[in-house]
Amino acid sequence: MTLAAPRLNRLPAGERGITIGDFLVPIAIGERISERARHAALIVIGAVLIALTANIAIVLHGQTFTLPGDVRVTLPVSPVPITAQTFGVLLVGGALGFRRGLMSAGLYLVLGLALPVYAGGASGLHTIIGRDAGHWALGATGGYLLGFVLAAAIVGRLAELGWDRHVGGAVVAMLLGNVVIYLVGVPWLMVAAGFDLTTGLAKGVYPFLVGDIVKLAVAGIIFPAAWWLVGRGDGTR
């Protein structure tokens, strides 16, 4: 927390609540309907981006992965996959802010109930929770999907406060978003698969740590660079 807090004081009051997403859709804000159209467009674009990153295949050491989002019980421990979807979720949250990030990730979650937009082309309520042999059962990936919504909202709120305008704040915001995803996803996976804590961490956390480090580094570059390009870097006009 202390890493980003000192910089927040530099953010002008008029800048708070503005995210980099406000510069992405060229629709005038003058009239109320135009503002609503801009927000709606950003929410839909964010949901589409999350869906696309859910199905980006990552190739490492000659093997292809489509993780995370599709965190399978049979996930190999090695080689460690570099993931795409969690970065997409956190990117959308940081770009759109609290409400739009929350709604965008939520829209993606709802779309996946009927359309094959979850990782690996999965879809349906059973991915989150369903009936198995007459009993309710949790889907192994359901916790991660729900965690995406919370993470997008949290990262979005931090972006509204200006954390993403400098390297330290962007990295910390993304780190907190990742932690939230794990806090929801790992216990859910443990219950769904009958894992103990050690196995849950081995299957649901450790294989993604290298990818997480890469995401944090990329986020620490992308967001401050984007703010610099629009002339609002580090909270300055």
Residues covered by each model-derived region:
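Interfacial aromatic-anchored transmembrane helix boundaries in multi-pass membrane proteins
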Residues: N55-P81, L107-A151
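Alpha-helical transmembrane segments in multi-pass membrane proteins
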Residues: L42-T53, V89, G93, S104-G112, ...
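Peri-membrane helix termini and adjoining interfacial loops of integral membrane proteins
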Residues: G14-D22, A114-H126, A193-T199
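Short helix-perturbing small/polar motifs within transmembrane alpha-helices
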Residues: E15-R32, I50-L52, G124-I181, P224
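Membrane-embedded alpha-helical hairpins and interfacial helices in multi-pass inner-membrane proteins
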Residues: L60-S78, G121-A122, R157-R237
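Hydrophobic transmembrane alpha-helices
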Residues: T2-A105
